[in-house]
């Protein structure tokens, strides 16, 4: 279904009106009770600007006059229509000796009586119902009791109803001073009345159905509290008027000085409280104290706690199935890979030609390698080491005496077999 446009428009007008009133209150805050001409002129200008914007006051007055004229024209039209189409009312007649005030005016019923209080007939529309014959099946007191609700009662009326309703039953009950909670709840919630029945047993309820002396309803308490309360604007105006004319004017410098003074007073107060609590703690008077204050008052407890700590070390036991992993693990440090300049003093560098002078892998060189290596590969024999490296002079190598009968054919065969067996085992 489409939304109701009229309802929305009406709601928006009310909301706009409330917003305008709120803006006016904010802009004229504290100026309501001022009687000066300038203040009143300012309030009037602000109100006009918020309500009518930038319109000229003459235009506003003219529009209001036009609205009044339209209303008057509508009233005249309604009066003319009523005169043209009004129903014809016959002259009202009553019997001899009857009181005219006991008869309702027929013209008043149609809304056409122009005599007002001078009319000899009654203008009370409830008079007809009062003059009706009573029905034997209806008790008028029931209607009166139904209309007589607790909303219209005062304390005296409430006590009277309670005494009439529960007076005799209270006399028969055992003596107790406890008031029934259902009774109190019904009174507080405005549910009590002539036809109220106690949920705790009706008239057989063992508790009292009477108000204790000096009892005050909650709604009456709230009214008294509301009467004592005053609005924030009135409180500010009252306090301002109580200050008098000889006061210091608030400026930025005075406000900052006041704020600094208040802050220093707060710090001094905290220090005094801390000193007092510290003295109470030393004297054993402070029963409730925080952990932070304990360490502030006695900082040596921090070191004592470290000394009393348990230094027991626990070693993890290794089972029979576990493998002892002795491999060390080092973290990667990026700084190790940064290139740096290294001093070359005391460092020997191999020659580039060492690969070209390397002896070929032939049977001729195996014997020399086994006996100590060739000098061409940069290796030194045991004799060179013993002689201090003096065997090589001017690129020539001294001949080493070799005993040809040292290794016979049988010895070489045994050596080859041992070498073959070693290769297989590896």
Curated annotation (Swiss-Prot):
Residues 1-30, 53-74, 303-328, 358-426 are annotated as: Disordered. Residues 61-86, 218-285 form a coiled coil. Residues 13-29, 64-74 have a biased composition (Basic and acidic residues). Interacts with DRG1; the interaction forms a polysomal DRG1-DFRP1/ZC3H15 complex which provides protein stability to DRG1 possibly by blocking poly-ubiquitination. Associates with microtubules. It is found in: Cytoplasm; Nucleus. Belongs to the ZC3H15/TMA46 family. A zinc finger (C3H1-type) spans 99-126, 174-212. One of its GO terms (molecular function) is zinc ion binding. SMART domains: ZnF_C3H1 (SM00356). The gene is Zc3h15. Pfam families: DFRP_C (PF16543), zf-CCCH (PF00642). It comes from Mus musculus (Mouse). Protects DRG1 from proteolytic degradation. Stimulates DRG1 GTPase activity likely by increasing the affinity for the potassium ions. Residues 53-62 have a biased composition (Polar residues). Keywords: Coiled coil, Cytoplasm, Metal-binding, Nucleus, Phosphoprotein, Repeat, Zinc, Zinc-finger. The keyword Coiled coil applies. GO terms for biological process: cytokine-mediated signaling pathway. This is Zinc finger CCCH domain-containing protein 15.
